[in-house]
UniProtKB/Swiss-Prot annotation:
Function: Involved in the binding of tRNA to the ribosomes.
Family of the protein in this entry: Belongs to the universal ribosomal protein uS10 family.
Assembly notes: Part of the 30S ribosomal subunit.
Gene3D superfamilies in the cross-refs: Ribosomal protein S10 domain
Signal peptide: none
SUPFAM superfamilies registered for this protein in UniProt: Ribosomal protein S10
Protein name (record): Small ribosomal subunit protein uS10
GO BP field: translation
Organism of this sequence: Mycobacterium ulcerans (strain Agy99)
Amino acid sequence: MAGQKIRIRLKAYDHEAIDASARKIVETVVRTGASVVGPVPLPTEKNVYCVVRSPHKYKDSREHFEMRTHKRLIDIIDPTPKTVDALMRIDLPASVDVNIQ
């Protein structure tokens, strides 16, 4: 697999969970002998939802809720078959979305 690259994108609402998952992936890759670039923090996506507090009137009274989506990018340079096997076996929290390219 010389000259190849694996790109892993992580997405989560909790920044502590995504950082712990990225740390676990980097440790696994380094232990199996491949080189790694990252984790690179990508821009945090912020969605704000405005909701009227009252069910009937008083439209001026509103409440704002926000959801932040944290993202990280990890590149694995020249992965070995042992690296790919270790990545398939790694156990990550369900709250972290992993996209491998």
